[in-house]
Protein backbone atom coordinates (compact mmCIF):
# COMPACT_ATOMS: atom_id res chain seq x y z
CA UNK A 1 0.00 0.00 0.00
CA UNK A 2 1.32 3.42 -0.94
CA UNK A 3 -0.44 6.26 0.80
CA UNK A 4 0.30 9.96 1.09
CA UNK A 5 -0.24 11.43 4.54
CA UNK A 6 -2.11 14.74 4.46
CA UNK A 7 0.35 16.98 6.27
CA UNK A 8 1.92 20.39 5.87
CA UNK A 9 5.40 18.79 5.81
CA UNK A 10 7.16 16.03 3.94
CA UNK A 11 9.12 13.90 6.41
CA UNK A 12 10.85 10.55 6.37
CA UNK A 13 9.28 7.73 8.37
CA UNK A 14 11.63 6.90 11.26
CA UNK A 15 9.75 4.04 12.95
CA UNK A 16 6.60 1.93 12.88
CA UNK A 17 5.30 0.06 15.93
CA UNK A 18 2.05 -1.70 16.76
CA UNK A 19 0.30 -1.05 20.08
CA UNK A 20 -3.44 -0.17 20.17
CA UNK A 21 -3.01 0.87 16.52
CA UNK A 22 -0.12 1.14 14.11
CA UNK A 23 2.11 4.03 15.19
CA UNK A 24 4.21 5.92 12.62
CA UNK A 25 7.00 8.18 13.77
CA UNK A 26 8.32 10.68 11.26
CA UNK A 27 10.96 13.38 11.50
CA UNK A 28 8.14 15.89 12.01
CA UNK A 29 5.49 14.13 14.10
CA UNK A 30 3.79 10.98 15.29
CA UNK A 31 0.71 9.45 13.66
CA UNK A 32 -1.76 6.63 14.30
CA UNK A 33 -2.83 4.45 11.40
CA UNK A 34 -5.99 2.35 11.53
CA UNK A 35 -8.62 0.86 9.28
CA UNK A 36 -11.09 3.56 10.24
CA UNK A 37 -12.91 1.60 12.94
CA UNK A 38 -12.31 -0.65 15.91
CA UNK A 39 -10.32 -3.71 14.81
CA UNK A 40 -10.73 -2.84 11.12
CA UNK A 41 -7.96 -3.89 8.77
CA UNK A 42 -5.98 -1.30 6.86
CA UNK A 43 -6.72 -1.59 3.13
CA UNK A 44 -6.10 0.72 0.16
CA UNK A 45 -9.67 2.04 0.50
CA UNK A 46 -10.03 1.84 4.29
CA UNK A 47 -7.29 3.81 6.04
CA UNK A 48 -7.39 6.52 8.69
CA UNK A 49 -4.23 8.45 9.63
CA UNK A 50 -4.32 10.93 12.51
CA UNK A 51 -1.51 13.13 13.75
CA UNK A 52 -1.00 12.70 17.50
CA UNK A 53 1.98 14.93 18.31
CA UNK A 54 4.54 17.21 16.67
CA UNK A 55 7.73 16.16 18.43
CA UNK A 56 9.44 14.34 15.57
CA UNK A 57 11.52 11.20 15.89
CA UNK A 58 15.21 10.46 15.49
CA UNK A 59 16.37 7.72 13.15
CA UNK A 60 16.54 5.21 16.05
CA UNK A 61 14.16 2.26 16.41
CA UNK A 62 11.25 2.92 18.76
CA UNK A 63 10.38 0.41 21.48
CA UNK A 64 6.87 -0.93 22.09
CA UNK A 65 6.31 -1.76 25.77
CA UNK A 66 2.76 -2.82 26.57
CA UNK A 67 0.42 -0.19 25.16
CA UNK A 68 3.10 2.49 24.96
CA UNK A 69 5.76 3.33 22.40
CA UNK A 70 9.01 4.85 23.62
CA UNK A 71 10.89 6.81 21.00
CA UNK A 72 13.84 9.14 20.77
CA UNK A 73 12.95 12.70 19.79
CA UNK A 74 14.54 14.22 16.69
CA UNK A 75 17.48 15.89 18.54
CA UNK A 76 18.33 12.52 20.22
CA UNK A 77 18.21 14.00 23.74
CA UNK A 78 14.65 13.24 24.89
CA UNK A 79 12.97 9.87 25.26
CA UNK A 80 9.21 10.24 24.84
CA UNK A 81 6.44 7.82 25.81
CA UNK A 82 3.62 7.84 23.27
CA UNK A 83 0.52 6.34 24.90
CA UNK A 84 -3.23 6.66 24.68
CA UNK A 85 -4.79 9.00 27.24
CA UNK A 86 -8.52 8.71 27.97
CA UNK A 87 -8.75 12.28 29.32
CA UNK A 88 -7.85 13.77 25.94
CA UNK A 89 -9.19 10.83 23.88
CA UNK A 90 -5.93 10.66 21.99
CA UNK A 91 -2.24 9.98 22.29
CA UNK A 92 0.17 12.08 24.33
CA UNK A 93 3.97 11.90 24.40
CA UNK A 94 5.41 13.15 27.69
CA UNK A 95 9.16 13.65 28.06
CA UNK A 96 10.60 10.74 30.10
CA UNK A 97 13.91 12.59 30.60
CA UNK A 98 12.44 15.73 32.16
CA UNK A 99 13.73 14.92 35.66
CA UNK A 100 17.13 13.72 34.44
CA UNK A 101 17.93 15.81 31.35
CA UNK A 102 21.65 15.61 32.12
CA UNK A 103 21.72 11.84 31.55
CA UNK A 104 20.95 12.14 27.82
CA UNK A 105 22.59 15.53 27.28
CA UNK A 106 25.20 14.18 24.85
CA UNK A 107 22.48 12.45 22.80
CA UNK A 108 21.67 8.77 22.27
CA UNK A 109 22.74 6.64 19.34
CA UNK A 110 20.48 3.65 20.02
CA UNK A 111 18.04 2.02 22.41
CA UNK A 112 16.97 -1.54 23.20
CA UNK A 113 14.58 -3.17 25.66
CA UNK A 114 15.17 -5.78 28.35
CA UNK A 115 12.01 -7.36 29.76
CA UNK A 116 13.42 -9.77 32.38
CA UNK A 117 14.40 -9.81 35.21
CA UNK A 118 13.69 -6.04 35.32
CA UNK A 119 12.13 -3.89 32.62
CA UNK A 120 14.95 -1.63 31.46
CA UNK A 121 15.39 0.46 28.33
CA UNK A 122 19.11 0.52 27.59
CA UNK A 123 20.79 3.22 25.55
CA UNK A 124 24.25 4.13 24.33
CA UNK A 125 25.06 7.83 24.52
CA UNK A 126 27.01 9.69 21.83
CA UNK A 127 29.97 9.85 24.22
CA UNK A 128 29.92 6.05 24.61
CA UNK A 129 28.42 5.71 28.09
CA UNK A 130 25.75 3.08 28.73
CA UNK A 131 22.55 4.33 30.38
CA UNK A 132 19.36 2.65 31.47
CA UNK A 133 15.77 3.60 32.20
CA UNK A 134 14.01 1.27 34.61
CA UNK A 135 10.48 1.46 33.22
CA UNK A 136 7.28 -0.04 34.62
CA UNK A 137 4.42 2.03 33.27
CA UNK A 138 1.67 0.24 35.18
CA UNK A 139 3.45 1.01 38.49
CA UNK A 140 4.49 4.54 37.40
CA UNK A 141 8.16 3.61 37.86
CA UNK A 142 10.78 5.50 35.86
CA UNK A 143 14.36 5.68 37.06
CA UNK A 144 17.42 6.69 35.04
CA UNK A 145 20.86 5.21 35.75
CA UNK A 146 24.36 5.29 34.23
CA UNK A 147 26.68 2.30 33.96
CA UNK A 148 30.41 2.90 33.68
CA UNK A 149 32.40 -0.24 32.84
CA UNK A 150 35.91 1.19 32.84
CA UNK A 151 35.83 2.57 29.34
CA UNK A 152 33.77 4.23 26.68
CA UNK A 153 32.27 2.39 23.77
CA UNK A 154 31.84 5.08 21.11
CA UNK A 155 29.78 3.71 18.22
CA UNK A 156 28.83 0.49 19.96
CA UNK A 157 26.02 -1.86 19.08
CA UNK A 158 24.18 -2.90 22.21
CA UNK A 159 22.45 -6.26 22.60
CA UNK A 160 20.61 -7.29 25.73
CA UNK A 161 20.21 -11.05 25.97
CA UNK A 162 16.90 -11.78 27.68
CA UNK A 163 17.04 -14.84 29.92
CA UNK A 164 13.33 -15.22 30.66
CA UNK A 165 13.91 -18.59 32.36
CA UNK A 166 17.03 -17.60 34.28
CA UNK A 167 16.02 -15.04 36.89
CA UNK A 168 19.54 -14.56 38.27
CA UNK A 169 21.28 -12.86 35.37
CA UNK A 170 21.27 -10.48 32.46
CA UNK A 171 23.99 -10.36 29.84
CA UNK A 172 24.84 -7.20 27.94
CA UNK A 173 26.99 -7.52 24.83
CA UNK A 174 28.58 -4.38 23.40
CA UNK A 175 30.07 -4.59 19.91
CA UNK A 176 32.46 -1.76 19.06
CA UNK A 177 32.77 -0.23 15.61
CA UNK A 178 35.95 -2.26 14.99
CA UNK A 179 34.03 -5.52 15.55
CA UNK A 180 35.41 -6.42 18.98
CA UNK A 181 32.85 -7.39 21.61
CA UNK A 182 32.69 -6.98 25.36
CA UNK A 183 30.25 -9.02 27.43
CA UNK A 184 28.97 -8.03 30.87
CA UNK A 185 26.92 -10.32 33.09
CA UNK A 186 24.95 -8.81 35.94
CA UNK A 187 23.72 -11.14 38.67
CA UNK A 188 20.70 -10.10 40.72
CA UNK A 189 19.73 -11.58 44.03
Task: Outline where the language-model segments fall.
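Beta-propeller and closely related beta-pinwheel folds
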Residues: 1-118, 133-152
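Acidic surface patches and DE-rich sequence motifs
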Residues: 26, 125, 176
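Conserved, well-structured core segments that form or line functional sites
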Residues: 120-123
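Polar low-complexity, Ser/Thr/Gly/Ala/Asp/Asn-rich disordered segments used for subunit assembly
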Residues: 153-189
